[in-house]
């Protein structure tokens, strides 16, 4: 599954553009999840880097009981290899 479509890339506000907006008012643009676990990444901002990778900012819950706002790169999400040949998925009901 393509995690970032062209439509999503265009919809993502640049990094730091919503830093004056309270966390509870930020709009989730795309949500990623582990289909075999409880990890989720609710992304609100992102910027493409010179190497073609994306730095994404959002609410990250790694399933350890301590969700937090933070950064993840698209490459990091794409490199997560799960059993049965699966990987991180994009929630098609968001955006």
What are these model-derived regions, one by one?
Residues 1-95:
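Catalytic phosphate/metal-binding cores of nucleic-acid and nucleotide-processing enzymes, i.e., regions
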């Amino acid at each position: 599954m393509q995690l970032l479509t062209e439509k999503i890339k265009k919809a993502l506000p640049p990094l730091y553009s919503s830093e004056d907006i309270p966390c509870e008012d930020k709009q989730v643009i795309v949500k990623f999840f582990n289909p075999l676990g409880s990890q989720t990444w609710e992304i609100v901002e992102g910027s493409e880097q010179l190497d073609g990778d994306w730095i994404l900012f959002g609410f990250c819950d790694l399933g350890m009981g301590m969700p937090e706002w933070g950064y993840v790169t698209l490459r990091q999400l794409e490199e997560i290899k799960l059993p049965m040949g699966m990987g991180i998925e994009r929630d098609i009901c968001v955006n």
